[in-house]
Amino acid sequence: MLIVISPAKTLDYQSPLATKKFTQPEMLDKSQQLIEICRELTPAQISSLMGISDKLAGLNAARFSEWQPDFTPDNARQAILAFKGDVYTGMQAQDFSAADFDFAQQHLRMLSGLYGVLRPLDLMQPYRLEMGIKLANPGGKDLYSFWGDQITEKLNQALEQQGDNVLINLASDEYFKAVKPAKLAGSLIKPVFLDEKNGKYKIISFYAKKARGLMSRFIIQNKLTKPEQLVDFNLEGYEFDAGLSAKNELVFKRAEQF
C-alpha cells in the first residue's frame, strides 16, 4: 500500500532530528522553475496570492530568494520532520524507530505545491506554496496545470517499487486534485473520519486532519500491507463502521470529545 498525505503550512526547523538519514527530492528541476516564477513576485503580490499577512508575505519572499537546490542537512530538513500541522501531530514521526522510517520511506508520500511528491526522508527547504493557489506558469493558470500528469506518474513509480497497486488517499481534496485517478496504476481507498457533534456524526476538519496522521502512524508502526487490515484502526477512540463503508471508502466514527 502507498499512502498519500498533504503537507502542512506550519514548519519546524528547530526540534532535534529523530533520524540522520536523508534523501534528495526527485523533482527539484520542477521546483526550481516554480521558485524562479515566485521570485518575480513582490511581497504585496505574495500576500494577495496566498491570502496571508504582510509579515508572512515578507518571510516567504525571503524564502523564495534564499532557496537553492543544493540541499544538505545544514540548510534543509527531512520533510516528515519539517511539517508540523494537524496531520503531523497525529503521525508523531519524531517518535518513529529506524524501522518505522524505513517503512514510511517505502510506503508514504507527501504531495507538495513546490516539490510535487516528497518521500519522508527527502530534504526540503522551508516554503509556502499551497497546491490550490492561482499561480500563472508556462503550463497554465495554476499549479494543477503546472504539475499535469507528473505527480500521478511519480506515484505510479512508487506503487510499482513497493509491490502492490493500492493507494490510500489520506490527503485533502485540494492536494488530491493534483492526482489523476484515471491514470493511476492502482485502486484507490479513501478513509473517512466522522466525529460526533451534538448527536450527529460529521467530518470536523481539525479532528479529520489529525485522524489522517493517526491512520498513517497506525499503518507505518504496524507495517500494514493489505487494505483489509485498515479496518482494525482504533487509535484515540475511532472505530470502523462497516454499514457506512463501501469498497473504496472506509468510514471510521468516534463519539463526541469532551
UniProtKB/Swiss-Prot annotation:
Any one of the GO BP annotations: response to hydroperoxide
Pfam hit, one: H2O2_YaaD
Domain of life: Bacteria
Annotated InterPro entries: YaaA
Gene Ontology CC terms: cytosol
Family, per entry: Belongs to the UPF0246 family.
Protein name as it appears in the record: UPF0246 protein YE0603
The species this protein was found in: Yersinia enterocolitica serotype O:8 / biotype 1B (strain NCTC 13174 / 8081)
Lineage: Bacteria, Pseudomonadati, Pseudomonadota, Gammaproteobacteria, Enterobacterales
